């Protein structure tokens, strides 16, 4: 649980530096790209999980 606290603290510090440093526009675009990559990976993972689950049954 402590590792999650440290992880979110680091993310918050980086977001604060980028937000208050004037790089908010660039960080928004990067966040959009990372979000869509994460959604695509989630969908691929879900489909692969469903296909593997059906073959074992």
Curated annotation (Swiss-Prot):
Keywords assigned: Cell membrane, Membrane, Transmembrane, Transmembrane helix
Residue ranges of the TM segments: 4-24, 30-50
Keyword hit for Phosphoprotein: no
Primary localization class, coarse: membrane
Entry keyword annotation includes Membrane: yes
InterPro entries recorded: DUF1328
Subcellular location: Cell membrane
Its membrane topology: Multi-pass membrane protein
Annotated Gene Ontology cellular component terms: plasma membrane
Domain of life (superkingdom): Bacteria
Family: Belongs to the UPF0391 family.
Name listed for the protein in its UniProt record: UPF0391 membrane protein Nham_2738
């Amino acid at each position: 649980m402590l590792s999650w606290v440290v992880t979110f603290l680091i993310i918050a510090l980086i977001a604060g530096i980028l937000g208050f440093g004037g790089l908010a526009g660039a960080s928004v675009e990067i966040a959009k790209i990372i979000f869509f990559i994460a959604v695509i990976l989630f969908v691929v993972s879900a489909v692969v999980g469903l296909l593997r689950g059906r073959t074992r049954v």
